[in-house]
Amino acid sequence: KNLPQTDVGGPWAIDAQITRGSYLIEMGHMTENNVDEWIAAAKSIGARQIDVHCGKTLRFGDLEPNLKAYPSGFDGVKRAVNKLHAAGLAVGLHTYAFYLAKESKWVSPVPDPRLGKHKMFTLANDLDDKDATVRVKESTKGMSTITGFLIANSVTIQIDNELIIFSEIETNAPYAFTKCTRGALGTKPAVHAKGTNVSQLRELFGLFNPDGDSTLFDEVARRTAEVYNDCGFDMIYLDAIDGAGALMGNHTPGYYQAKFIFELNKHLKKPALMEMSSFDSHFWFARSRMGAWDVPSKSYKMFINNHYIDNLTYAKSFLPRNIGWWAIWDWTPKDRMRMFPDD
């Protein structure tokens, strides 16, 4: 009885009209002032939906609008969505699931104690508000300062209400985090007493995440539902949900993925056309479409062939399948093969 109930997902997805047709992903360039241009672009390629990719115009996690794009905040977002609806287009909210921007309200200016923690330490001595070296009692052996979009590692530690970014690590006793930036990410440098907890935050995709077993995890899901409801969105794409392994809580990644999806669906006022960047049998009841792959950067024709073969397998899911995503690459980057007219 606790399974998500939606007439555009699971057993009803294949008959729902909204699950058909192409969608245009806007990567943070649409504003309240240029919506007409996006409507024209969508119409020119026969797209029936515009997917608003969060990150630039809506902040990951708390989904607060960028005031440069929407000076009047959510009122401007609602006007943009209404204009797209008037043009006959559905509108998608493309989030990074439970991941949180480093500027979000749960991180800055006061970091939430429910943020996901990786390694835990104890201050070895009193720390004033200017010290650039944080000494800890426990070993730091095996820790790294290497971070990146696909690297599950963070150089940010939390002590009380302060975040500190370290540049180097002393892995031999006395153990320490060195060359530190105090009061990082808009927090306030402070004095901390010997014996205080020092927590390395969890990070992936350049974003923090909540403790998967905390109330913050559910709070992020409810916030996503709130913005979806208030702004009148029609679709939700839960990108980055495949990064649930970085939560490393008391359960498997699939548990946290399903937990987030179930909590989100409980608070939606209208059914959402829903996709996500991972799949498990527990998601099927809420999922509306299958087959979205990230854009290829080379071997475009082989990509289509492989995608088609994979979609044959997903025919057993009884969900509509697509063969996106696509991007038209220019000739600037050095790390991708050029796109030619027959691509």
Language-model-detected regions and their locations in the chain:
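Aromatic-lined carbohydrate-binding/catalytic grooves of carbohydrate-active enzymes
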Residues: 17-120, 202-221, 225, 229-254
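Surface-exposed interaction regions enriched in Ser/Thr/Asp/Glu
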Residues: 162, 189-202
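Long, internal scaffold/assembly segments composed of regular secondary structure
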Residues: 256-261
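Beta-strand-rich recognition/accessory modules
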Residues: 1-19, 28-36, 40, 334-343
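Autoprocessing Asn-cyclization modules and mimics
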Residues: 97, 101-182, 186-189
